[in-house]
Regions:
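C-terminal catalytic/substrate-binding lobe primarily of soluble NAD(P)-dependent oxidoreductases
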Residues: 1-190
Length: 190
């Protein structure tokens, strides 16, 4: 579809009534969604667009938090592997292998809202939740269920070969596994 580039700044989002900022995973997630759409013969139409952002909140506080987050994200992205800047960053950031404690992983969670807009102005809203830390607990469960799905559930996706995405390789079989075994929920709100 006629997608624009990923969000590069802070802006106000009328649909959410809040300030939004770039989301670090958007650079990967958006490409996976768009490739899935293309592999499925543009099932949502050639005008389908997809992007992601992270809410930084409402009002002036949300705007300030958005710009602070943007600066922090930019600072992380600037650290080339062998640069002095990266060496300085490594003094304050977690080392490889470090991360949240077991208690933090177990008590972590995520939730996000997805808004779909149709040409006629109709909106559809969905909520996705996970019962563990998204960077560790939920991701490991998603990977495990993906492996089990590929090994045990046969060809459930819409595509059989090539460079596939999770949805085109595993389809609803993966969605069902994530809901049944990985602590995720996918709910249409309106």
């Amino acid at each position: 579809g006629p997608d624009k580039g990923d969000l590069q700044s802070v802006k106000y989002d009328n649909d959410f009534g809040a300030w939004i900022m770039p989301f670090i995973m958007a650079a990967i997630n958006t490409r996976v969604v768009r490739r899935s759409h293309a592999l499925n013969d543009y099932v949502y139409g050639k005008d389908f667009r997809y992007d992601e952002a992270m809410s930084s909140g409402q009002g002036i506080t949300g705007r300030i938090k958005g710009y602070a987050g943007l600066v922090a994200l930019g600072a992380l992205m600037l650290g080339k592997p062998d640069s002095l800047y990266r060496k300085l960053l490594s003094k304050v950031l977690p080392s490889p292998g470090e991360g949240p404690s077991a208690e933090e992983r177990e008590s972590g969670y995520f939730n996000f809202t997805v808004i779909g807009k149709f040409k006629n102005g109709k909106l559809i809203t969905a909520k996705v939740t996970g019962d563990r830390d998204p960077g560790y607990g939920s991701t490991s469960k998603m990977l495990g269920e993906s492996a089990a799905c590929l090994a045990l559930d046969g060809k459930k996706g819409t595509q059989k070969s090539g460079v596939l995405t999770p949805s085109t390789a595993m389809g609803d079989a993966l969605l069902n596994r994530l809901e049944e075994n990985a602590g995720l929920s996918f709910t249409i709100l309106s």
